[in-house]
Amino acid sequence: MQITTQTIDEVLYPKIEAHTTGFLEVSNLHTIAWERSGNPDGIPVIVIHGGPGGGSQPSYRRYFDPTKFDIIQFDQRGCGQSTPYAELEDNNTHASVSDLEKLREHFGIEKWHVFGGSWGSTLSLIYAQNHPSRVLSLTLRGIFMCRKSELHWFYQDGASHVFPDAFEPYRDHIPLPEQGDLIKAYYARLTSDDVCLLYTSPSPRDNTG
C-alpha cells in the first residue's frame, strides 16, 4: 500500500478549532501561549511539540478523538506565539519541564496523558521521569533523543546523503573552513550581535516535528 497525503488524511480525525486560548506567565521573562480543543470534560492530553524551537500545530489535534479528549497544546518558551519570541535566555529543558507543571496546575488537572513528537518525545520522557505521578500514559512518535549522534546525522552527515538537494544550500551558506561543525557555525551566527550577519543566515526548515 502506498502511503499518500490523502491516505494519512483519511485516518486522522476531522479538523477542529481550539475553543479556548490564552497565555500563562511562567517567569519574569517568559509567557507561554496555550490552547484547548476537543471535549472540555474529556480525558486530558498534553501535546508537546518538536524542535527545539518549533511550535504547536493545528494538525496535532487530529491525532485525538475530539469527543473523548481534552486536547491541550502550548508553545514552548521562545516558540510560536509565546513571548518573547526566539528568546534563549532562561530557556532550557528544566524550564520546559517546570512550565508543563505550571500548565497542569493552571488547569487544575491531576493527571494527564503526555503525547510528544521528535524533540517533544525527549521532553515528554524527562517530564515523566520528574513527575511520574502526574502521567497517565506516554505516547511518543518520531522519537528523537537529542543525542550527539542524532544531531550529527540530522545537521552534519547523514541526512545530507538522503536529501542532498535540500542539504546543500544549508551547508554552502557557511564558509568552507567552518563546515566541519555546522551547528556551531549557525549558533555563532544566530546569536551574533551583528545584525547584518544575523539576517543573512537562512532558516533551515525544522522537519523533526
Question: What do these predicted regions represent?
Answer:
Residues 177-201:
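Conserved alpha/beta-hydrolase catalytic His-Asp/Glu region
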Residues 85-96, 149-157:
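Catalytic nucleophile-loop/oxyanion-hole region of alpha/beta-hydrolase
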